[in-house]
From Swiss-Prot:
InterPro entries for the chain: Ribosomal_bL17, Ribosomal_bL17_CS, Ribosomal_bL17_sf
Any one GO cellular component localisation term in the record: cytosolic large ribosomal subunit
Annotated family: Belongs to the bacterial ribosomal protein bL17 family.
Gene name of the encoded protein: rplQ
This protein's record includes keyword Ribonucleoprotein: yes
GO biological process assignments: translation
Record's keyword terms, sorted: Ribonucleoprotein, Ribosomal protein
Record's subunit section: Part of the 50S ribosomal subunit. Contacts protein L32.
Keyword Ribonucleoprotein applies: yes
Record-linked NCBIfam families: L17
UniProt lineage: Bacteria, Pseudomonadati, Pseudomonadota, Gammaproteobacteria, Lysobacterales
UniProt name for this protein: Large ribosomal subunit protein bL17
SUPFAM superfamilies the UniProt entry points to: Prokaryotic ribosomal protein L17
Organism: Xanthomonas campestris pv. campestris (strain ATCC 33913 / DSM 3586 / NCPPB 528 / LMG 568 / P 25)
């Protein structure tokens, strides 16, 4: 019985899951918008939101903690320089999950994961 066992396994080993969410969180912090399956998006919240909370207070200990969880210098730098100050007054709820239909190959439910309050860049219209 799996009573009180939180988290999804995704038919992966624990190391594979950890690496997958580490990479997804780093990509999310770099690009501020990623597309993935809906269950992975929901599980990514459990990884990314605490990291943004850590990023709100810049310091050596917090940077080392974030680097230990992300293993990506560029993502950690952006987390503390850009994202932490942006969400300094927000008490959680840093991610938005938007459903994005179904994947063509296997009909898996897809979703966009984006950081709330991200600056929207106007796209150029090619003529």
């Amino acid at each position: 019985m799996r009573h009180q066992k939180s988290g999804r396994k995704f038919n992966r080993t624990s190391a594979h899951r950890e690496a997958m969410f580490r990479n997804m969180a780093a990509s999310l912090f770099k690009h501020e918008l990623i597309k993935t399956t809906l269950p992975k998006a929901k599980e990514l919240r459990r990884v990314a939101e605490p990291l943004i909370t850590i990023g709100k207070v810049d310091g050596v200990a917090n940077r080392r903690l974030a680097f230990a969880r992300l293993r990506d210098k560029e993502a950690v730098g952006k987390l503390f320089v850009e994202l932490g100050p942006r969400y300094a007054t927000r008490p959680g709820g840093y991610l938005r999950i938007l459903k994005a239909g179904f994947r063509a190959g296997d009909n898996a439910p897809m979703a966009y994961v984006e950081l709330v309050d991200r600056p929207v860049v106007a796209e150029e219209v090619s003529e």
